[in-house]
Amino acid sequence: MIETTKGGSGSYPIKTIVVLVQENRSFDHTLGWFKELNREIDGVTKSDPKSNTVSSSDTNSLRVVFGDQSQYVNPDPGHSIQDIYEQVFGKPWDSGKPDPNPGHPNMSGFAQNAERNKKGMSSAVMNGFKPNALPVYKELVQNFAICDRWFASVPASTQPNRLYVHSATSHGATSNDKKLLLEGFPQKTIFESLDEAGFSFGIYYQFPPSTLFYRNLRKLKYLTHFHQYGIQFKKDCKEGKLPNYVVVEQRWFDLLSTPANDDHPSHDVSEGQKLVKEVYEALRSSPQWNEILFIITYDEHGGFYDHVPTPVDGVPNPDGILGPPPYNFEFNRLGVRVPTFFISPWIEPGTVIHGPNGPYPRSQYEHSSIPATVKTIFKLKDFLSKRDSWAGTFESVITRDSPRQDCPETLSTPIKLRGTMAKENAQLSEFQEDLVIMAAGLKGDYKNEELIHKLCKETCVADASKYVTNAFEKFLEESRKARDRGCDENDIVYCVDDDDDHVVIPPQSHSEASNAAAQPKTQTSFFNKLFSCFIRHD
């Protein structure tokens, strides 16, 4: 049972903020063509075509015009920090010595980078969805608000950007940092700030939650804040028991029985549309509806084209930590623009939010705007980093004196865009590898380099999904045992092996804890360990 939510959020009518962060789609790719529905949107039109050449240094090379033919996208475009550098600045990343001052972000390298990664991919990268292809978003655009100046926090891949959503920093990560994935990222999060102030939060997961990237959320005291989405979310909505801060986590692995609904290519975005529809309708029918602000955004652009230059001036490093060599990224520029929705009965239909009015002259909307706005609405004491103190806040989207009574109760049924079945034998994406590494840390396999490597590089989606699920279930089981034995609520359970053994450790690194941990009784081979995990899960 979630504790009773706390009111008292001052002059704001919002007592519950719900956050859903989808995967890897740019603004133009997703909502650019929605300008035909609302001319206020900074999108794209046939009368003012946007384009890239396949060679940004040769103006006579093939020019690819941004189109409106997106449907099912496969494969996954490049979106590493190196790829994004080329997409944004129009010149390839120099692996020996990348330019720390690359100049104006002319957004001219998307087609070039796509062709460099795979011949013919520029067609997928330089296309967006027609509004009718995304019927759920079409209705949300017409009935609520979108922001057309929201940027990814880092010009990098999924995991660093997701870290900013709840902590306003990636703690120096620009891609998957295995050590930190195993140990958990140590920075303070908005979850702790809320908890310290007496507000409640809940994480509703459909697959082992990525919020366990944060080390502090692995503490025993936060176990009761994690809920199975399919069992608890609609129930809590119906009973009016949603906490003050709600995070909905998706299905990250594309399986035949449960297709991925995170919108990550090559997943079918119609599954993501179904998820948004389901979450919205549950919130809309809740007795808490008139106190809810629902935010949908995307972690990063996924390599897809966007025409708005990324901000490169005045962006503060959140905590003074630099990225890894050889670039030593200073976290002083943002990523590519991504779609963002604000949904509440306190918002006028068809609202378009552009850039923020402060708190600084060059402030922008980015993922750190979420904890910054949570701080504002709930009057929390401190910022998490220099980044959320700089980021624009969006409480001003609440403009009405009374809640609307005409918000749609249901949304349209999505259109299936993929003509094939889920590919369970596919290789893992980088983010799926991140989840596997995190799971190895939870399960106690952190020292088994061979196991981790094979899980990430030689295991298919279906088998990796089983491993992650098994690891999470083991972590929960051992954590519950430790809690029942009266262990300190600030401790973190450290699973030792495939037996029922565990040790409870304070918040310190796995490397420190390993000296005190019980060693496995037998050395299990990769295939036997994997097999035994799967049999136990099934």
From Swiss-Prot:
Expressed in which tissues: Expressed in root tips, cotyledons, on leaf margins, stems, young anthers and funiculus.
Alphabetized SUPFAM superfamilies for the sequence: Alkaline phosphatase-like
Record carries keyword Hydrolase: yes
Membrane found in the keyword field: yes
Induction entry: Induced by auxin, zeatin, salt and inorganic phosphate deprivation.
Places the protein is found: Cell membrane
GO-annotated biological processes: phospholipid catabolic process
Keywords (A to Z) from UniProt: Cell membrane, Hydrolase, Membrane, Stress response
Membrane topology of the entry: Peripheral membrane protein
Region feature Disordered, mapped onto this chain: 91-112
Catalytic activity: a 1,2-diacyl-sn-glycero-3-phosphocholine + H2O = phosphocholine + a 1,2-diacyl-sn-glycerol + H(+)
Effect of inactivating the gene: No visible phenotype under normal growth conditions, but mutant plants display decreased ABA sensitivity in seed germination, root elongation, and stomatal movement and have decreased tolerance to high salinity and water deficiency. Root hair elongation defects under low inorganic phosphate conditions.
Record-listed E.C. numbers: 3.1.4.3
Pfam families (alphabetical): Phosphoesterase
Record GO terms (molecular function): phosphatidylcholine phospholipase C activity; phospholipase C activity
EC class of the enzyme, as a word: hydrolase
GO CC field: plasma membrane
Family to which the UniProt record says this protein belongs: Belongs to the bacterial phospholipase C family.
Function: Non-specific phospholipase C (PLC) which assumes major PLC activity during inorganic phosphate starvation. Substrate preference is phosphatidylcholine (PC), but can also hydrolyze phosphatidylethanolamine (PE) with lower efficiency. Has no activity toward phosphatidic acid (PA). Plays an important role in the supply of both inorganic phosphate and diacylglycerol from membrane-localized phospholipids during phosphate deprivation. May be required for lipid-derived signaling molecules that positively modulate abscisic acid (ABA) response and promote plant tolerance to drought and salt stresses.
Family matches, as PANTHER family: NON-SPECIFIC PHOSPHOLIPASE C4-RELATED
Name recorded for this polypeptide: Non-specific phospholipase C4
Source species: Arabidopsis thaliana (Mouse-ear cress)
